[in-house]
Curated annotation (Swiss-Prot):
Coiled coil (residue ranges): none
CC per GO annotation: COPII-coated ER to Golgi transport vesicle; endoplasmic reticulum; endoplasmic reticulum membrane
Source superkingdom: Eukaryota
TM region positions: 8-28, 54-74, 113-133
Family label: Belongs to the cornichon family.
Protein name from the UniProt record: Uncharacterized protein C2C4.05
Molecular function per GO: signaling receptor binding
InterPro entries according to UniProt: Cornichon, Cornichon_conserved
Protein location: Endoplasmic reticulum membrane
GO BP annotations, alphabetical order: endoplasmic reticulum to Golgi vesicle-mediated transport; intracellular protein transport
Amino acid sequence: MVSAWIYFTSLMLTCANIMLQMYFTVMYSDLKDDFINPIDLSRKLNWYVLPEMGFQAFSALLLLLSGAWITFLLNVPMLAWNAKMIMSNTHMHDSTTIFKDVSSRQKRSFFKLACFAVFFFVYLFLFVSRLVDE
């Protein structure tokens, strides 16, 4: 029963990350269409950058500690990418350079959204299969 709750927790954290990535994508398109200024965009999005990375890291840690190696290994590339962004200090949005970076950040957000969607369906399948097994 513990593994089912681990997958359920990972499922909910991934759901939160999907919502955050959709919010990021909408905000980037608002900046492109000039509905929001760069200072407001940076202020709004920087508030959610570290929680998004934290949710993903906590989910991966739960999977590691529960012994779900395959699903943990599925998370390792995104963990490494997030760690690289934090170490190179490119994870936060800078209002002075956001116009230059908006298309690459939007592509990054789409990629993360796709990855989190895959994680969501994997966790959903594993959660349901663990419940059926018990």
